[in-house]
């Protein structure tokens, strides 16, 4: 039952269509309050959101449910997802909640949770909360009237987050002489660009005028080519593209070339290994990361540990293995020394530190990783049947794997947040990548639509 609610990154869907309705959000607040309330002390919840118009709806509904269960709610307004994770730890809160659909368009929204340590909730806890939300038999254990919660607005949350971010950058280093273009996707980080200016950089801003409807609209991490054009026009040193909730980063070099999460991870891993600071010489990434990244780590005396897709699974593996660097090709980058989740602005500062230390163009520094040709194609599906239960899909998959003969990879997976099957093919020969991706997508369209 609960799997109808939570995907790989919390609850997500189209606004005013189940499950993204005010009614579900109210019950979500009641359920979360019921689950996390314990003892006689006052309980704190941090709620942040991105810039979607519908954020007001879900912020109010969640707040009502939580306060009804005796939780005090601290609303921080538009705020990056990683900022809510940080503030949950910093303010000693019991729970952090983010209202965002990340890189999705404005008509979607979502809800995700952080525990008191700033980590995303385990699947089992999400499932318990979801079962309370969905069950018609749930009996709410309301507190007495004098013990209901209050709602507060925190005005200095942005300042706290910026101080924390700047702490991750060397105190004796500045960004004097660096010119960058920052694309905030008209999202949660729209007002935070001055942080780079405080460190000395010249900043050209785009995607920093949200109106509630333009989040991720032809801007941000899904449209790096637009950023690349602007970087070249401005003669900037690099471009930084965030998504709607600023938990991911895509970078553009001074020539306008796009660098994805794999390239950024390779640069950061190389820097940490060079300084003897990469624990176990291990990098954690997902099954989507390019084979070239895995080979790069091996060639440099390290290793790559792969996880299922989702930065939460990367973080879980990092905690288990004692790794300090991990991420996703999509731009979620986790620096465990400073953060418990993906943080686009934090990752940007770590990359800028390398750029300043090396004093070389980004296009040269990124040349350490030559990616194998890779293609990802989405196929819309009516329902997510297990691939192993569809003989035609299994036959096509086996045939492609045999033809690649170990010189490439094929990955079929369902999106955790959309009704989409994803086909990923990777090989040394780009023509084979195109051919096999098209063939497999055709089989999925025929048998899963």
Swiss-Prot record:
Family: Belongs to the phosphohexose mutase family.
Gene: glmM
Phosphoserine PTM sites in chain numbering: 102
GO cellular component annotations of the record: cytosol
Cofactor-binding details, from the entry: Binds 1 Mg(2+) ion per subunit.
Name assigned to this protein: Phosphoglucosamine mutase
Post-translational modification: Activated by phosphorylation.
Organism: Maridesulfovibrio salexigens (strain ATCC 14822 / DSM 2638 / NCIMB 8403 / VKM B-1763)
Molecular function in Gene Ontology: magnesium ion binding; phosphoglucosamine mutase activity; phosphomannomutase activity
Cofactor(s) listed in the protein's UniProt record: Mg(2+)
Role of this protein: Catalyzes the conversion of glucosamine-6-phosphate to glucosamine-1-phosphate.
HAMAP family: GlmM_B (MF_01554_B)
One GO BP annotation of this record: peptidoglycan biosynthetic process
